[in-house]
């Protein structure tokens, strides 16, 4: 099979796939190419980490069980470097603890094998779509001391900028657009992720916890027991 172009300007974007099973890597490559993406494949974690730094892909698909460095460690190092490229874990592991650990490290989604290659390509497209297409005139959102700029995709707690992953940003923005409205976990999965995550509603809880930890005392997020989440409406 000929190599898929890796020039991100020639296609919809470059996707880096870190997968040590050749058959699975080729299958992912084929479906991503059909969707219009360039694809670069690495077979071990160390090479994948170096390639991510060098190529600056639009998104990364990481197998958890990679040789050299596993996918979890690759994601951990990326986030430690303040690299917020969208990361989707692709793995045979289906244990809830593994899923939660991956999400807590800043992964945007978690896909377990066997998976539908077409759905995987759709999830990549969904993550990338959320980072683009915001009208230039869309005003910043403010709730309490938290300010979110949907155009530049930046979040501030007071005067300090807070680094969020793509999904953390989108989740916070969705809640801040309707202060006081309570969303169920199922609603948030449908409206923010656009599909049912393999990690289930637990993925919402993990991302909410991560946002709270990063915003600290200024976090406007409120848990409504037995229902879901909301942001505190500003006081008048």
Task: Please place each PLM-identified region on the residue numbering.
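N-terminal/domain-start alpha-helical segments
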Residues: 1-132, 236
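Residue-level signal for beta-strand positions within conserved beta-sheet cores that form or flank
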Residues: 11, 35, 83, 144, ...
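Short, Lys/Arg-enriched segments at the junction into DNA-binding effector domains
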Residues: 11-14, 125-182
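Short, well-ordered turn and helix-capping elements at secondary-structure junctions
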Residues: 43, 66, 70, 94, ...
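Residue-level recognition of specific faces of alpha-helices
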Residues: 65-68, 77, 86-89, 93, ...
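Positively charged, aromatic-enriched patches within helix-turn-helix-type DNA-binding elements
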Residues: 107, 112, 154-220, 225-227, ...
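Structural detector for helix-capping/boundary residues
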Residues: 118, 144-146, 151, 186, ...
